[in-house]
Amino acid sequence: MSEFFNYDELTWPEVAALSRDVPLILPLGTGHDLPRLAAALANPARVGLLPAFPFGWRGSGLELPKIILGRYVGNLISSLREDGFTRAYCLTPQGESAEPYFQLPKPEYQIALPLSNVARDASPLPPDTERGKVILMPIGHTEQHGLHLPLSVDTHIINAISQGTANKVPQRAYSLPVMPYGVSTHRPSFAGTLSAGGRSFEDFWLGVIDVLVARGFERFYLMSGHGGNTSFLVNVVKYAGERHRRIFCATAFLHTSGPIGAAALEKYRTSKIGGMGHACELETSFMLHLRPELCHMERAVDETDFISTPSYYMDWLEGGSLVANPPWDDDTRTGAYGAGSHATAEKGRLWLESAIMEKAGHVEEIHEQQERREARRNEGFGLWGTNSK
């Protein structure tokens, strides 16, 4: 009988140690028949399950064009193949025609099985009853986080913040399921890291907004738990605003980074500048609070020897005025930026509360912005008097 394990619960050294012929499966949705999958793989000793892709395909409740979904997922599978994993596949629902749902870069990248518990016709996502709310779009990633944290850090953190925000202001916001895959431009440096590719990532999220705007939604907040997503989300916001002139679509730099978050970080942090970056005091504290069983604090190594100059250095809220992307290998031996040894679960609890409070405030601002702007448009303000589109 095959043993299934969760790929994203491993640390990057544990991924590096995996046999390159172990099957790694990225499923579209959940509820697949795992014994049938094992049989299709010839019953290997072990099978790694990657986080389920939450939506985008027919029957998921939020369908995108096949070419957009295929490029996004194809890049993820290619990431694993490029790292030498010869049996990396996307698990897709097989249609009634017995044909795979979409085409990936190579046919062998895909395993299609008949639907089991996966719904054929899921309810619309979000439900139509959520129109008028800010639609939260939490996006994490599956990537290395030092020696002591799993690949799932960014996903767990932003999911907790997004769900916490929706629960705090349920009449004002609705959270989509978290997306566990983003963009990493440092992917080859440390094992385990995937990347959707910048342009495919932008096309996917712009496609999500296109679909939801067509259904009558008009307020969106793209929330990221992974720094590598940031610049691409800015582009999505710009494209969305240009394409759909009567919506309000926003993003922000990560989380715990506005006035509320900055004050909380300053109050409770014990590391110096350079101690908060990646697999650091902040992210490790979040994980000690949210998923302590996945933290291996005995392996934590503080990495604060970032090559710093006055306009280019590393910390959560600071980094100088220069924007650059040198190899991670220049500044870290273990994949961490910061001082994870300073982390505590109590700090994680306090910082999560601050992050949720901050995001709830952003929700209110998005509502205010959209309402005030629509009022001006309807009054015929400026050029809106001659162009109402």
Predicted features by range, described:
Residues 1-221, 227-389:
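Extended, histidine- and acidic-residue-enriched regions that form the cofactor-binding/catalytic faces
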